[in-house]
From Swiss-Prot:
It comes from Rattus norvegicus (Rat). Its main location: cytoplasm. The lineage of its organism: Eukaryota, Metazoa, Chordata, Craniata, Vertebrata. Associated to surface IgM-receptor; may be involved in signal transduction. Involved in regulation of the catalytic activity of the phosphatases PP2A, PP4 and PP6 by protecting their partially folded catalytic subunits from degradative polyubiquitination until they associate with regulatory subunits. Residues 47-61 form the UIM domain. This is Immunoglobulin-binding protein 1. Residues 226-291 are annotated as: Interaction with MID1. One of its GO terms (molecular function) is protein-containing complex binding.
Length: 340
């Protein structure tokens, strides 16, 4: 009797789902920092409720891959979103030391949700790469011509289609929300409402997985230099190299010196006087002032040279005048009367 009373006190599956879904909606519009205590408490609470809901779904065996989407009751379609909600809440956990674990766990939740929707043919989409289908994807890509260009074009087209579908789904959901939540909608509208939610979360999950893969790559690339430095530090240290001097540089230093100018210790005159004092230089090596006779002889020679130059100029002038006269007075110019 006590056990049955405890079971009645436990929250039921609809309550777990609606409470956790409401917590996620509150977190989506919250203005507080994601790392605040209030936000993280709601994240932990939502994950705890969804974990219980997932356990109940597993015990009830509510979904089976052997059945079609039409065989699932309309009211039970919403429980297919449990893994997607788990992935969304896991992404909101803030712990830098466990960020990689959170990303990998969130990716597993999103993949689980997408796999279920793919099996039930909720919408047409391509499953992201996983460990199970990675070999098939690699084989298909290797057989394609220009795989990078084709993959980029297909991804771009898929994003455009998802964006269009997202706008259409959100518009249709806003039209059905009030009727379904108030209980006035019939089974057909309820079914359409939850199918639209599933398609909306398919687009969200695909976008989140792309973002997760990029962040995981960044985190792994950031940790790889640390691992390399740790491996290098574990290697035994080599003895330091001894300095050596090149023979060429040593010989060059002997010829040209050390490469910097030496400072003078005396002037040239001081050096000359010092050598003359010790008899290291002959007397004729020192210039003496000229004598008076030498000056007179030099002056006479200079005067004679000037006189010779003047005589040469006069003689040259006479010769030029004589040449000019011969040009104007040809031979026989003065004896014209005796011409026969």
């Amino acid at each position: 009797m006590a056990a049955s009373e405890e079971e009645l006190l436990l929250p039921r599956l609809p309550e777990l789902f609606e409470t956790s879904k409401k917590l996620l909606e509150e977190l989506e519009v919250a203005t507080e920092p994601t790392g605040s205590r209030t936000i993280q408490d709601k994240v932990s609470k939502g994950l705890e409720l969804l974990e219980k809901a997932a356990g109940m779904l597993s015990q009830l065996d509510l979904f089976s891959r052997n059945e079609d989407l039409e065989e699932i009751a309309s009211i039970d379609l919403k429980y297919l979103m449990v893994p997607a909600l788990q992935g969304a809440l896991t992404m909101k956990q803030v712990n830098p030391s466990k960020r990689l674990d959170h990303l990998q766990r969130a990716r597993e939740h999103f993949i689980h949700f997408l796999t279920q929707c793919h099996c039930y043919h909720v919408a047409e989409f391509q499953l992201p790469q996983t460990k199970n289908n990675s070999a098939e994807n690699n084989t298909a890509r290797s057989s394609m011509a220009y795989p990078n260009l084709v993959a980029m074009a297909s991804q771009r087209q898929a994003k455009i289609e998802r964006y269009k579908q997202k706008k259409e789904v959100e518009h249709r959901l806003s039209a059905l929300k009030s009727a379904v939540e108030s209980g006035q909608a019939d089974d057909e509208r309820v079914r359409e409402y939850y199918l639209l939610h599933l398609r909306r979360w398919i687009g969200i999950s695909l976008e989140e997985i792309e973002s997760i893969d990029q962040e995981i790559k960044i985190l792994k690339d950031k940790d790889s230099p640390r691992e390399e430095s740790a491996c290098q530090s574990s290697l035994p240290e080599k003895p330091p190299m001894k300095p050596f001097i090149l023979t060429r540089n040593k010989a060059q230093a002997k010829v040209f010196g050390t490469g910097y100018p030496s400072l003078a210790t005396m002037t040239v005159s001081d050096w000359y006087e010092q050598h003359q004092k010790y008899g290291a230089l002959p007397d004729r090596g020192i210039a003496k002032p000229p004598s008076a006779d030498f000056q007179r002889a030099a002056q006479q020679q200079e005067d004679q040279e000037q006189k010779d130059e003047e005589n040469e100029e006069k003689a040259l002038h006479r010769m030029r005048e004589w040449d000019d006269w011969k040009d104007t007075h040809p031979r026989g110019y003065g004896n014209r009367q005796n011409m026969g």
